[in-house]
């Protein structure tokens, strides 16, 4: 997304805001550096809001475009969410196709899953690994308990108007840029 934004609007400033402190290192990679200008964690955003006396309780919940996010997209931050989104699209397009999934949470489990996959223990499986146990909602820059975040994400995902990201206006606009 950042690459497309920069291609079509080179003067745009792209800011990633999320719970993942590792995104800061990722944004410094040579392949990404010119596309993402800033990375802020939720913890940093809380500090900014506090310093600027921003009262989040009195801000409209739905800035333009946010409500168009899909159920699958909203669930990305929870362990198993990315793989489930892929499975949902495969099942939609190929209902008779079996999809085998293996998930890992935390670096130790991720290493173990990759080791087993390298040894051929998961042929044909879709593998998902989340560095933080519980998923991105448990990242170093999170501000609340993991279970509370997972529940909040689940409730937010259920409110989506679309199941699949391909149904959202935002993705339709991105598709036009790619074509």
Task: For each feature predicted by the language model, list its residue ranges.
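Iron-sulfur-associated redox domains of electron-transfer enzymes in respiratory
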Residues: 1-179
């Amino acid at each position: 997304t950042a690459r497309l934004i920069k291609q079509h609007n080179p003067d745009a400033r792209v800011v990633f805001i999320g719970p993942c402190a590792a995104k800061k290192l990722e944004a410094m990679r040579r392949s990404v550096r010119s596309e993402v200008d800033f990375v802020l964690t939720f913890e940093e955003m809380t500090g900014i809001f506090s310093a600027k006396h921003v009262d989040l309780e009195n801000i409209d919940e739905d800035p333009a475009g946010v409500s168009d996010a899909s159920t699958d997209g909203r669930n990305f931050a929870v362990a198993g969410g990315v793989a489930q989104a892929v499975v949902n699209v495969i099942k939609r397009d190929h209902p008779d196709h079996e999809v085998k999934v293996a998930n890992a949470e935390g670096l130790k489990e991720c290493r173990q899953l990759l080791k087993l996959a390298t040894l051929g223990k998961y042929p044909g499986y879709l593998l998902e690994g989340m560095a933080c146990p519980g998923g991105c909602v448990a990242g170093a820059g999170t501000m609340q308990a993991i279970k509370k975040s997972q529940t909040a994400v689940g409730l937010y995902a259920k409110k989506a108007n679309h199941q699949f990201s391909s149904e959202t206006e935002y993705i339709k606009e991105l598709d036009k840029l790619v074509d």
